[in-house]
From Swiss-Prot:
Pathway: Amino-acid biosynthesis; L-arginine biosynthesis; L-arginine from L-ornithine and carbamoyl phosphate: step 1/3. The lineage of its organism: Bacteria, Pseudomonadati, Pseudomonadota, Gammaproteobacteria, Vibrionales. Belongs to the aspartate/ornithine carbamoyltransferase superfamily. OTCase family. This is Ornithine carbamoyltransferase. GO terms for molecular function: amino acid binding; ornithine carbamoyltransferase activity. Its main location: cytoplasm. L-ornithine binds at N169, D233, S237, M238.
Amino acid sequence: MAFNLRNRNFLKLLDFSTKEIQFLIDLSADLKKAKYAGTEQKKLLGKNIALIFEKASTRTRCAFEVAAFDQGAQVTYIGPSGSQIGDKESMKDTARVLGRMYDGIQYRGFGQAIVEELGAFAGVPVWNGLTDEFHPTQILADFLTMLEHSQGKALADIQFAYLGDARNNVGNSLMVGAAKMGMDISLVGPQAYWPDEELVTACQAIAKQTGGKITLTENVAEGVQGCDFLYTDVWVSMGESPEAWDERVALMKPYQVNTNVLKQTGNPNVKFMHCLPAFHNDETTIGKQVADKFGMKGLEVTEEVFESEHSIVFDEAENRMHTIKAVMVATLGS
């Protein structure tokens, strides 16, 4: 079934129905097949797209740029030091300027209110590449990846757990997405790091309508039992103080995804997911600092799990591009 999402913003999954989200995932799968088959049709020819990045990025920037180029669009990258936003010019004014020059705008930055204001005043489709509260394009990629590794299951038949800092943008967005799609999600971590109570209540109400299930628990064994997928993210997010590491590592260490946690699912075919980047060894600057300070060569996930046959993180990363392409084509394409 086709949906007309033309000229819609893509700011958070709460704005979209179950059928609209499924449509975007299905479109992503179709576009992925077309790219692999060499039969892709350019739906964004002649379009100009602005990519605003107030936070650094690898996957999101590359995904937007490659997706746009594949579809025939031109992009302008505006980096953290490449604009006057918030310094000499408000987002409201920036939106009204860029909206007259560009056909679509991506924003990756800080508060959700910023991208909401951009979306309200730009007059063209605005896409959320990540804010402190939500990361909706990531969840489209996650759900496409789950479907690819579920042997024909529908999303509503999938059970998964997110371990660690569940109050961050990925934890929030996975909970919203699971509620919308009628999935069974467990958020497993210290209670102090559970999502905001108001958002949990809203998601519980959605899940009641879709047949989904949301569980919040501090008990790892309880949270992962029977899961098809285990998901985690870094314990300290972009923009947080380095001083947060001491307290965070102590709290989060019991929620590291390791081989014992995989076994606790009782599912020998369980898959591991991570939005990346991941601290799974000491081969990065931060990874080495953490190893030296805490005696841990992996934080949220061990090297053994990350490099195992259970890990599908690079399928997941690739799908960022296909799902972002679907969002742009659906909201902007001819």
